[in-house]
Amino acid sequence: MKAMSLATSGISTSNVAAANSNTSPVNIEVAVRVTGACTYNVEYTLDDIFASTFTQGAATWFNHPTLAAGQTTTKDCQITWPVTGIRINQTAGAGSSATTVLQAGI
């Protein structure tokens, strides 16, 4: 899979990176690089992000257990269970984040 880039600046959420939930085993790397001061968390959804009715605001988002609320530094995590979408939620600060999402096996 081609690496996907996500970004936030100020209090915002990134676009959604699509994940292939049919791959076994699931192995997704999420690397978040922080510039300046920002607080963020990595979130994932099981909702159908390709549905015509999908909106980020109406989707059910779960915090990644390792990079849950309150992260402030450059970090990475793995997702090893089926998900359909991944995003970054910047909850505080005027800084920014640049994130790379890479899924192995496809």
Residue ranges of each PLM-predicted region?
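Structural beta-strand segments of beta-rich domains
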Residues: S24-V30
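Residues that flank catalytic or metal-binding motifs in active/ligand-binding sites
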Residues: V26, C38, T84
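Extended, low-complexity, turn-rich repeat/linker tracts enriched in Gly/Pro/Ser/Thr and Asp/Glu
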Residues: A31-Y40, A92-A98
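Surface-exposed loop/edge segments in extracytoplasmic proteins
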Residues: K2-S5, I49-H64
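Short, surface-exposed beta-strand/strand-loop-strand elements in extracellular ectodomains
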Residues: A37-Q56, T100-G105
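Acidic/polar N-terminal loop/beta-strand segments that form early-domain functional surfaces
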Residues: R33, T45-D47, A59, T91
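Beta-sandwich interaction modules
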Residues: L6-T23, T60-I106
